[in-house]
Amino acid sequence: ILSGPDDSRVSGIVRQLQMVDGKMSGYVPGTINRRVVLLADIAWIQTDGNVAVIHLATGEKLESSSRLTELEDTLKDTAFVRTSRQELVNLDHVTGIKPAGSGRMLLSLGEKTLVASRKYASEIKRRIGIV
C-alpha cells in the first residue's frame, strides 16, 4: 500500500489488517521506529494528549497517533474493554478487581492499579462474568 505519511484512510486499513492478525503497531517514544507487537502483549492503552500510549506487559511503552475511540472500535472483538475516558484494558492481564466506591472499580494489572469509572463498570462486569 502506497500513501503519504498522513493518509488516515490507509492508516486505518493497515490498523484493521494488523488486528485481524492479532497485532498492533506503535512507535518507540521519541523515535520514528515502528514496532509491531502481539495484542496479547499489551496490558493497557491510555491517552496522553494527542497520543495513545500502549503499555506492554514488560513495562515498555509505545505510542500511536490513533484516537482511543478508533482503537476501541478496532479492538471490539478482543479482550480489551474501555475502563474510563482515557483507558482501554486487556482483561487477560487483569489479576484482581476490587470495588472502589461510588460504583468504580480498581483493576490490578501486576503492580499497576487502574481505576475503572462507574460508567464502564457494568460492561467490565459483564465481560468477566460477574453479572
List PLM regions with ranges:
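Short beta-strand-to-loop capping motifs
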Residues: I1-P5
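Conserved binding/recognition cores within well-folded domains
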Residues: D7-L109, V115
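Glycine/charge-rich catalytic "coupling/switch" loops of P-loop NTPases
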Residues: R126
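…primarily DNA-binding HTH/wHTH and HhH modules…
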Residues: G129-I130
